[in-house]
Amino acid sequence: MEQRREMLEELLYAWMEMSLHIRGNRILDSFSFNEIMICGLLHRRQVSGQPPLTATELGDYTRLLKSQINHILTGLESRGLIFRERSTHDKRVIYVHLREEALSSYLSEHEKVLDIVDSICTTLGEEDTKQLTALMRKATAVVNNCISKEEL
């Protein structure tokens, strides 16, 4: 039992350490962590040709509160990085778009993150990287399942 407890503590510490490094080291110059997440979701959606996202959908994806999403979107909008567009089919729905002018700034910051990910992949090698990716997805599914059970 003590061995399992130590393993759990080590995993938690490793997770916290990675999270702190990602959030606390100011890797990005032009965006906060949450802003780059929002822009990343908007960019992926635009590139894939899927319909744009709403603020509610962004909140669902990021697990941020509606007030946090609105604060982030207002900031991005005031900097001219996004625009909001009311649906022609349902006036209650407002879509969020990444502006073309914001693309170079976003992609530049995205490249910085990819450089870090590339360093991880180079250090781990292809097989370990694939295994890490699979394990991260599996762990995310477990966390989502635990949270879903708590919400019931």
What residues fall within each predicted segment?
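N-terminal leader segment of winged-helix/HTH proteins
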Residues: 1-34, 40, 79
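Amphipathic alpha-helical interaction segments
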Residues: 10-13, 37, 131-134, 138
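C-terminal regulatory/oligomerization modules of transcriptional regulators
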Residues: 1, 127-152
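Hydrophobic recognition helices of helix-based DNA-binding modules
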Residues: 18-22, 42, 106-109, 113, ...
